[in-house]
Amino acid sequence: MENQYQRIVSATAREDSQARRSKPLFLNAWSQTSSVDFEVLRSISAPDPQVEVENRALRDKVRYLEAKLQQHKDLLSQIHATSARMQQASSLLAESRPPTPPAVQSHHILTPPSSEICAPAQNPQILDYKIISAPDDADAIEIRLAAESLNSLSTSADSDRLEICLGDENHQQSNHHNSQQQYRISNGIKRDGSSESADTPLQFIKRRKLQEIQLQEEIPRQNIKLPAKPQVKARNGSFTDLNKGQQQNMDNVMVSIGPNNTCVPASVFENINWSVCSLATRKLLVTIFDRETLATHSMTGKPSPAFKDQDKPLKRMLDPGKIQDIIFAVTHKCNASEKEVRNAITTKCADENKMMKIQNVKRRSSGIKHEKENII
């Protein structure tokens, strides 16, 4: 049998059998398929619109959540990077910063009445010293003047070049040469101390040298270079420092405001309100010219068209170079037009002229009243 199958497999086909296989197979069949069956197929294959809408909404929500998640990831990465940079910067600062000495706490120290004032500290801006209030009082007050307190003392009346002495004023003058623990802080505050006997009551004395001659006498005795002291004015028994030295130094600094090199004090120029053109112009006019000059002069020196028919004396013209510098400064600082600045100058001159006339009338009227009183 195996030999027969092998012969059949290896046998060659006839031509008529090959032609019969290549012809298509036609099947005549009768079926009972109706249109309802096709509708069912369409309903199964076609998706439900509501389900499609829900699927679309779910996909949108998924995309939104993915976007939010990505934003959170970016934010966290930025926060981590920033914190890492800050930690690195703080570590570098800590490495480069010199070691800070331990803070000295203020506390009360029991010292005998005959003890002298403590030696000056090494740091000229931080001062620790003691003041003994009475010979029988063992409690000493330890006062710490730091940089902040020194700045606050510089604005007070008794802060500049203040002397703190222990003992009577007459006895202090006699023992001034024997005092060895004297020093001066960089801003001018100094302290003199000397040991006193138990019989002499200790007093807290604040003295100021009012004249430059006394200052010159103190310099060779103390061998200390002190800055020049401003004038001190006494009111009701107390000394008040006017602090005019710094203001005069600021007033001596002049600022050029235009191409013609018209100069005004730097303190005045910095305090001008440049937001209003007219106010800035008036301030510069009053600073450069006096009020009498503004009252008797005008910007152009020509008569006003409004007073052509009236016989009024002509006013002299203000310095054109200074006027040009004022216009230059105001137009650049206030972003105003040249016409606005010129109108402000003309108005200021007219106002000063009116004020001068009113003052002259008041003076005449007061003079007439005095004459009548003298006659009566």
Swiss-Prot record:
It is found in: Nucleus. Residues 50-79 form a coiled coil. GO terms for cellular component: nucleus. One of its GO terms (biological process) is positive regulation of neuron differentiation. Signal peptide: none annotated. It holds the Pfam family BEN. GO terms for molecular function: chromatin insulator sequence binding; sequence-specific DNA binding; transcription corepressor activity. InterPro entries: BEN_domain, BEND6-like. Gene3D superfamilies: BEN domain (1.10.10.2590). Keywords: Coiled coil, DNA-binding, Nucleus, Repressor, Transcription, Transcription regulation. Residues 258-356 form the BEN domain. Its main location: nucleus. Can act as both a transcriptional repressor and corepressor. Represses the expression of genes involved in neural development and preferentially binds palindromic sequence 5'-CCAATTGG-3' to mediate transcriptional repression. Acts as a corepressor for suppressor of hairless (Su(H)) and inhibits Notch signaling during peripheral nervous system development. The BEN domain mediates DNA-binding. Homodimer. Interacts (via BEN domain) with Su(H). Interacts with Cp190. This is Protein insensitive. It comes from Drosophila melanogaster (Fruit fly).
